[in-house]
Amino acid sequence: MAWDTARTRQALLDAAVDEFAEHGFDGARIERIGTRAGVNKERIYQYFGNKQRLFGQVLETELERIATTIPLTAEQAEDLGHYAGLLYDYHRARPQFIRLLHWEGLQDRGGPALKEPERTATYGSRVAALARTQRAGALDTGLHPEELFYAVLALAAWWFTVPQAVRMIFGGPSDPEAERASLIRLVRRLAQQGGSV
């Protein structure tokens, strides 16, 4: 029976997403990734070279996934609250992504990030969409488009970054539907003409 390299590689990537999200780069173990994937750990070295390259591939794959799943065009930017709701939904369904970014941030020493030029271009296209929408009069111009985009990213992710703060501030366990509705309302208010803080 032939070895299914594509399936094995994907199983390793899937297992690595969970391992790196749970433990970060330093805490992740190649042995656990192999065990989770049901594959000999030597396959990791065969397909990815080393742990650093595997982490890079995991992060790159997850970044591509969110970029293609939730694009932002000028038309979509007209309802920035809806976009924020989509981000919230994504983070809720795939919490590993935001955890991977936080682990990457904890390791940041000021040098270039993985695929930084490509990521900068992706962010830039979204900022440009917001700028076009602002020029068309559909969004508040009191904030720079970069500030507005960054605020939306932060607002959508923070619920999942510090769930303990959500419990303490809101006085109880998480209520995803209420959180999502609040986020959408807040971003719409922030983005509407005259809504800047």
Report the location of each language-model feature:
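N-terminal intrinsically disordered/low-complexity leader segments
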Residues: 1-7, 197
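Helix-turn-helix
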Residues: 11, 15, 19-53, 57
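Amphipathic alpha-helical segments that line or abut small-molecule/effector binding pockets
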Residues: 14, 77-106, 120, 146-150, ...
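Short coil/turn segments at alpha/beta junctions that flank glycine-rich nucleotide-binding fingerprints
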Residues: 22-26, 94, 136
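Amphipathic alpha-helical linker/stalk segments
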Residues: 56-83, 117, 123-126
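Amphipathic alpha-helical packing segments from all-alpha helical-bundle domains
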Residues: 67-70, 110-136, 146-147, 178-181
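C-terminal peripheral helix-coil segments that are non-catalytic and often amphipathic
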Residues: 89-93, 124-136, 154-197
